[in-house]
């Protein structure tokens, strides 16, 4: 009898653990991005100066291009990672260096340069 109880407990525990797991994969959609920008074109002139940003179409919800230095750019997708199912997007605050997602999501704010909060 004891030999029968132990395997039943193990099998029961296994099914109990499996039923408690949620299959809630919240991944940002994979969207390949491949484009070039010509800084001599009028639509990209704001990127000729460090500290400036530009929002362009592409990616999942758009792309933010930020000119960090004369030689470095930071490029981010605008899709908020808080709750992907809500479809919120990231915006650049008026100071030009802080990013935030919509208040309906998490109203989080972070620095565009390194992602620190």
What are these regions (language model features)?
Residues 22-96, 108-116:
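N-terminal pre-ligand scaffold of iron-sulfur
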Residues 1-21:
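Sec-dependent bacterial lipoprotein signal peptides
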Residues 104-105:
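Multi-pass alpha-helical transporter architecture, strongest
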